[in-house]
């Protein structure tokens, strides 16, 4: 059901900065009248561009350009929407917005246009999020995945699961509410078979969603190690250009350096850090503190070791980084150990039986094996496997639904199977409906839409 907001909102819909064209968007009950007061005439033909002069409340010409109206409900937000398309100078656009506000509109909050579209059933929550993902896409693969989500591919998968659960709930709850009908859902095998099918389908969607999340977010990899282990050299080798300064002087890198690259369509967020050692230098100490802070936020830690150094146990971080024992004590993070400088030590490059990787960041030997390892541990199967984009909250919701379905299967043959199974099915449905926004807390909606652009 369409619901009209009491106020009219306005915002610049094009990117900040200078451009050939800039768009100011209005949405709400006064959108048409406010726009008419600016262009000096009634907006007669919906969805047709009209060339006009834009004037302020004193009648002074601010700019000239096109005006297009989209009366409710056939608009992006489901409300009356007007776009004023003028020249893309920031000052001109700011004056247009100020004129709209003076005429009765208010400045839109971040993501408020998309939020109104969601509340007016013009799109579900995954489609609304896909708009932001499409705008933020850093790779062709992530843009394609976001577009598929915007077109409803992810929503359709979730809705199919919900429909299957509703069918199961009807059958199970009928057996509970009408015992006189003698519906025996245990003996006929229907519920067990249907529940197993739904669980398998949910597991498949979860796998695809994980691929969609990887295409969207990628993996954050912190490169850590002692000074002069070759951390910055590895970052440069993976990036394909000199992102970091490399010298033979220990402690060259003193701050956190970031670079985003792609591994076959998967974003890899590289973080180069200061060499870990005891230092009296205040600046170096701050760099080391920041290195530990980045480790706590990373998806994976890559520990660089000079392959000429003797090692007792590559699986023991305290042996690899003895000076970091206290800081790493409670760090629960998957680790990849890389033995660098094979060109100097003479070691054969590639993966070792103990799980370490031998490389030469200087000449690139062993890097292909390391790249393949990073894709493997991330669970990335290739950009062709991501049919839609997904976020961490989607993964969490699908995991909750899967846990409820697995619990339901376990309840089938226990005492009070009907009541417990019905509760698990309700929990699974609730988790899935959080994805599309059928059941979503207001504070979650606020967090989601506040991350959008102002003009969306």
Swiss-Prot record:
Residues 218-379 form the TrmE-type G domain. Its EC number is 3.6.-.-. GO terms for biological process: tRNA methylation; tRNA wobble uridine modification. It is found in: Cytoplasm. GO terms for cellular component: cytosol. It comes from the Bacteria. This is tRNA modification GTPase MnmE. (6S)-5-formyl-5,6,7,8-tetrahydrofolate binds at residues 25, 83, 122, 456. HAMAP family: GTPase_MnmE. SUPFAM superfamilies: P-loop containing nucleoside triphosphate hydrolases, TrmE connector domain. It is an enzyme of class 3 (hydrolase). InterPro entries: G_TrmE, GTP-bd, GTP-bd_TrmE_N, GTPase_MnmE, MnmE_dom2, MnmE_helical, P-loop_NTPase, Small_GTP-bd. K(+) binds at residues 228, 247, 249, 252. Binds 1 potassium ion per subunit. Homodimer. Heterotetramer of two MnmE and two MnmG subunits. Mg(2+) binds at residues 232, 253. Belongs to the TRAFAC class TrmE-Era-EngA-EngB-Septin-like GTPase superfamily. TrmE GTPase family. Exhibits a very high intrinsic GTPase hydrolysis rate. Involved in the addition of a carboxymethylaminomethyl (cmnm) group at the wobble position (U34) of certain tRNAs, forming tRNA-cmnm(5)s(2)U34. PROSITE patterns: G_TRME.
